Amino acid sequence: MFRISRLGWVWVGCLAVLTIIGCLRSEITIAADGGLFSMGLIWCAILLGMILSMRRSPLRAFAVPLECLAQLIAVSVICAVLQYPAAKIARPLIDAELAAIDRALYFDWPACFAWVLRHPMVLNLLSGIYLSLGLQSALSCFGAWRQPDRASIWLSANALSLTCCLTVFVIWPAGGAFAYYQPAGIFSDYLEQFVAVRSGSLTTLAIGQMKGIIQFPSYHAAAAVLLGYAFASLPRWIAIPAFNIEIMLSISAAPIGGHHCGGSGFLDSGIS
């Protein structure tokens, strides 16, 4: 556990340095507001709890889950910031190519999206599951009580997946299906930020306002595979429902997240 964990922290440190360099080069600043202060305070409290738990025998069982949670928060926030300098590189978009892959696979994104809109129950279900990624990730850290090595492997794989998503995003950026098909009456706040940062008009970021602007590949689809692995070691009455939720999380990436289906699906499986 601890060897893999140390590797994860080294990776987090490298990503943090890369984020600082990226923000300086792209002239993007992070607003020192209440959101940043609160996030830092929560993270420090978790880290302090981990240290205290390691020093007291009755509380030692809490140390590993708290370390996993601290590492998860660190890599998530750092990569959330890093996506903005990555987007500002502004290479040509590949949405037309991704849409062509969808057509070759006989996947009609506008028809799929319209069908989901016509079925409110499906829309609410997929939206809820799509938005549950953060909560699911946090809960998976507490699986470290049962199998600490498995939790540490999932965290390291998660950090690597985020890094791969960022790398692909820099080389082959995409605005996503919402930008390409422009469905009537649909407003996407992630798309507004994506366009703003590529044009250079977005130069200040607040932690509470950051969105997931990476549309290719889909991190949600990749995370569904990793979370399935994380929950697989738990009792069957937890693992089986969790497995079904991860399937729906992967499905929700297209109609809820606005991701192109074909290209993202194959690449995400490879990344995971």
Residue ranges of each PLM-predicted region?
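N-terminal transmembrane-helix/juxtamembrane module of multi-pass inner/ER membrane proteins
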Residues: F2-I42, F62-L139
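Interfacial segments of alpha-helical transmembrane regions
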Residues: A63-L72, A138-P173, A177-A184, A239
